Amino acid sequence: INTLILGRNHGTVMIAEESTAWPKVTGKVEEDGLNFSYKWNMGWMHDCLDYMKLDPYFRKNNHNKMTFAMSYNESEKYILVLSHDEVVHLKCSMLNKMPGLEGDKFKNLMAGYAFMMGHCGKKLLFMGQEFAQKQEWSEERELDWYLLENPEHKKIQNWVKELLHLYRRN
């Protein structure tokens, strides 16, 4: 089905949200692959979030959480996703996952986004993450756009914009 859809619809992207180590998800059908455009890198997402949630004092023995995904990066065409699944059902917003005082949270989030943009793979942020939405996401309300009146939230939005420009240029 992926071959059919990708062949008929120029510009279409098929992404597999796959959490096992199933091989060749992005491989060609002729090579026993499933022919998805990208595979969601669930391992990177969980490891990165686990690391970013740690108080910096405790990170020194956990750097492997930030580097492990590089050991298997060439096995598939990955997309790095920070999805809605991570900001619902009492899991906190991205900003509120970060340790420390409010100023520390913003700096941590900026560092996390910079790491994501520098890591191999395509990128995908869920809505509201680009300006550090404070509340968990809910389909029952709109995003807190008023937060962009706050300089810290505007700074995050501009940071993400600059990171995306840098990413697209390289």
Where are these regions (language model features)?
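Conserved alpha/beta catalytic core and glycan-binding cleft of carbohydrate-active enzymes
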Residues: 1-140, 147, 165-168
